[in-house]
Amino acid sequence: MATSNLLKNKGSLQFEDKWDFMRPIVLKLLRQESVTKQQWFDLFSDVHAVCLWDDKGSSKIHQALKEDILEFIKQAQARVLSHQDDTALLKAYIVEWRKFFTQCDILPKPFCQLEVTLLGKQSSNKKSNMEDSIVRKLMLDTWNESIFSNIKNRLQDSAMKLVHAERLGEAFDSQLVIGVRESYVNLCSNPEDKLQIYRDNFEKAYLDSTERFYRTQAPSYLQQNGVQNYMKYADAKLKEEEKRALRYLETRRECNSVEALMECCVNALVTSFKETILAECQGMIKRNETEKLHLMFSLMDKVPGGIEPMLKDLEEHIISAGLADMVAAAETITTDSEKYVEQLLTLFNRFSKLVKEAFQDDPRFLTARDKAYKAVVNDATIFKLELPLKQKGVGLKTQPESKCPELLANYCDMLLRKTPLSKKLTSEEIEAKLKEVLLVLKYVQNKDVFMRYHKAHLTRRLILDISADSEIEENMVEWLREVGMPADYVNKLARMFQDIKVSEDLNQAFKEMHKNNKLALPADSVNIKILNAGAWSRSSEKVFVSLPTELEDLIPEVEEFYKKNHSGRKLHWHHLMSNGIITFKNEVGQYDLEVTTFQLAVLFAWNQRPREKISFENLKLATELPDAELRRTLWSLVAFPKLKRQVLLYDPQVNSPKDFTEGTLFSVNQDFSLIKNAKVQKRGKINLIGRLQLTTERMREEENEGIVQLRILRTQEAIIQIMKMRKKISNAQLQTELVEILKNMFLPQKKMIKEQIEWLIEHKYIRRDEADINTFIYMA
C-alpha cells in the first residue's frame, strides 16, 4: 500500500517541484542565517528524493547550487571591492572569506547524495569526508575563479606590506596576514596537492619579499656596525623571522614553508657574508672569546661548508699555542716528568674548556681538538727519542719520535713507586693522576715505547719491592686494558704479578723446609723470585759475576728445592736483577746498605782485608765483572749523590767512570757514616741501588732495537692479515687499513710501510698488479 502511494506521488518528486522549497534554505545557509531543525531535515530528504526519482535531478541540483553560490560570491566581492584602502580591503575580504569558509563545511552535508549519483561513490556508514565533497569543491572553485583570482595580487601585496611594516617595528593586526594565508591554504580543491595555490602564491611572495628586505638591510648594517655586532644582528633576525614564520606561514607536517623561509634568511643574512664573518674566527680563538665564537658557530652551522674553516682555525691554534707553551716551559719539563705531564694536562683542559664553552662539545670540534692535541703530544721539537736499527751490522736511525711516552711512563713510576711524591698523596689522588696519564696516553702515537718503559719500571718496582700500593699497581694493569692497550702486552703485565704471588708461596715453603737446617745464609734472610721468561722478557745476555761464598752455597739448595716441585723446568739465575742488604760496621757506627749483587760482589772483596787498597785490575779479577759493569758499579760506590761520605774512596780523582785506569786504587772509607741535619748518625739505612738500571748498556740497546724489530714484524703481520682478507687492494687503502690495525701500538712511518711491502713482494707473499703498480695482489 505504501509503495503504490509512493509511485502515485512520483510526479511531485521532480527537481522543478522541490527546488522552490530547497532554495530558500540554501540561501539562508550561505548567508549564515538560522534554519529550523525541520527545514534542515527536509533539505536532506528533498535532495535524496530528487536524486532518486528524477533522472537528471542530481545535475540540476548541482547547476542550481552553482548559480546561487556564484551570485552570493559576487555580492561578497562587491562588498570587498567597495574598500579602496589596502588594510580595509584585507579586513573586508577576511570577514567575507571566513563566513564563506565556515559554510563550506555546513552546506555540503545535505547534498551527500550527489556523491553517489554524480560520482558513483558508495555510501558509507562512516562519517563523510567533507573535504572531498563535490559541493565543497564547487564552493571553493567558484570562490577561487571569481573573487579570489581578481583580487589575489592586491591581497598578497597588502599582506606583504604589513609584514614589511612589522619588520620595521610598526604594529598591526597580525590576523590580517593570517587570514590571507588561511584563504590561500584552504582554497585549493586539488586532492593531489591541496597546498598548491598557497605554495605558488603566498609562500613564494613571502619568501621573495623577505629576501629583498635583507638583501638591502644586511649589507648596510654590516658596514655601519662591524662584523661582531652584525653577528648579533643576524642571530636576532633569524630568531625573529622564525617566530614570524611560525605565525604567518603554514606549519602542517606536509608543508615545509618555515624551513624554506629559514633557508632564505640564512642565505641573505649569513651565507652572503660567510668569508667576512669567518675572517674574525682566528682572532676570537686566540683571544678566547667564547661567547662570540659560540654565536659564530651557531650561524656557520646553518651554512653549507661553514664549519670546516672554523675547525681548521681551531686545529691551527691548538697546535701553535700548545707547542709555544711547551717550548716556553722546555727548561723545566724536559727534566721533570711530573711538570711535563701537568703541562700537557693544563693544555688539554684549556682547549677542552674552549671547545665546551664556544662550541658546546660539538663532535666535529672535539675531533679537531683531538687531532691537534695529538700533534702537540707527538711533536719531537722539544725533546726526541731516536730508536737505532741495526741491519747487517750497520747502525741506522729511524725518524726521531716524541719522548712523550717515555716521560709518561716515568711519571707513572713516580706515582707507583715509594717516592716523596707518592708519599704525600692519598690513594684516591694517585688513582686520579694515573687516569690523567691514561688520558694523555690515548693521544700518544707510539704506545709501544710507553709499554717498554712502563714494563721496565714495573719490573724494577716488583723486584726491589718498592711499590707504593700493590692494589693500585694491579688496577693500573686493568686500566691499561680498558684504554685499548694490546692484549698480549697487558696479559704479560698480569702474569708478572702472578709470578710475584707464586714466588711468595714458594719462599714460604722453602723457609719451612730449611728452618732447622744450617745454611750458609739463614733461610729467613732469603727472598727468591721465580720469574717466567716469557712474561718478563729478559734479555738472553747473562752477566757473570763471582758471588760471595754464602750465596754460591745457597744456589744449589734453591735449585734442588725447585726441581722437587717442578720437574722438567730449568732455572736461569739473573744476578743482574738481584739485590740484598749488607751490614757495614766501623768505628763510627753500624749501617745497613741496600745494594745490587754487583755492588755486593765489589764490597765483599774487602771482607778479609778491610783496610787495604785494591786496584781496578784486581777488582776485575776478584769480581769477574765485565769492564763496563764494573766501572758503573764502582762509580755508584764512590760518587753516590745522596751521600756526603762515600762508601769507597779512590785515587787518583777522575771526572767519570770511563776515566778509571787499571791502576786506580780503591779503599773502604773507614770514616763512612750517614749524616742527617749536619749530625753524624751511629745507625741508619741507605739504598745504594738508586736509579741504577737492572739492565746492562747492551741490553738497553737490544731493547731499543727490539722495539723497531717488533714494529717491522707487526707491520708485516698486519699487511698479510689485510691481504688475506682483501685478496686485492690499492696502496692507499692498504696504508689506511694498516694504520687502523696498528694504531693502538704505534703509527707506522711511510718509509717503513714501503720497505715492508717491498720485502713481502721480494719473498713472494704479495705481488703488484700488472695493470696497476699501485695495486697489490695476495699470493697464497
Swiss-Prot record:
Modifications made to the protein after synthesis: Neddylated; which enhances the ubiquitination activity of ECS complexes and prevents binding of the inhibitor CAND1. Deneddylated via its interaction with the COP9 signalosome (CSN).
Keyword Ubl conjugation listed: yes
Protein's pathway: Protein modification; protein ubiquitination
Gene3D superfamilies: Cullin Repeats, Cullin, Chain C, Domain 2, Winged helix-like DNA-binding domain superfamily/Winged helix DNA-binding domain
UniProt GO molecular function: protein-macromolecule adaptor activity; ubiquitin ligase complex scaffold activity; ubiquitin protein ligase binding; ubiquitin-protein transferase activity; vasopressin receptor activity
SUPFAM superfamilies xrefs: Cullin homology domain, Cullin repeat-like, Winged helix' DNA-binding domain
Keyword entries, A-Z: Isopeptide bond, Nucleus, Phosphoprotein, Receptor, Ubl conjugation, Ubl conjugation pathway
Compartment annotation: Nucleus
Pfam families: Cullin, Cullin_Nedd8
Alphabetical GO biological process terms: cerebral cortex radially oriented cell migration; proteasome-mediated ubiquitin-dependent protein catabolic process; protein K11-linked ubiquitination; protein polyubiquitination; protein ubiquitination; radial glia guided migration of Purkinje cell; reelin-mediated signaling pathway; regulation of cytosolic calcium ion concentration
Domain of life: Eukaryota
Record-listed Phosphoserine modification sites: 34
GO CC list: Cul5-RING ubiquitin ligase complex; nucleus; SCF ubiquitin ligase complex; site of DNA damage
Cross-link (Glycyl lysine isopeptide (Lys-Gly) (interchain with G-Cter in NEDD8)) at residue(s): 724
PANTHER family referenced in this protein's UniProt entry, alphabetically: CULLIN
UniProt subunit comment: Component of multiple cullin-5-RING E3 ubiquitin-protein ligase complexes (ECS complexes, also named CRL5 complexes) formed of CUL5, Elongin BC (ELOB and ELOC), RNF7/RBX2 and a variable SOCS box domain-containing protein as substrate-specific recognition component. CUL5-containing ECS complexes specifically contain RNF7/RBX2, and not RBX1, as catalytic subunit. Component of the ECS(ASB2) complex with the substrate recognition component ASB2. Component of the ECS(ASB6) complex with the substrate recognition component ASB6.
Family: Belongs to the cullin family.
Known role: Core component of multiple cullin-5-RING E3 ubiquitin-protein ligase complexes (ECS complexes, also named CRL5 complexes), which mediate the ubiquitination and subsequent proteasomal degradation of target proteins. Acts a scaffold protein that contributes to catalysis through positioning of the substrate and the ubiquitin-conjugating enzyme. The functional specificity of the E3 ubiquitin-protein ligase complex depends on the variable SOCS box-containing substrate recognition component.
Protein name per UniProt: Cullin-5
Lineage, top ranks: Eukaryota, Metazoa, Chordata, Craniata, Vertebrata
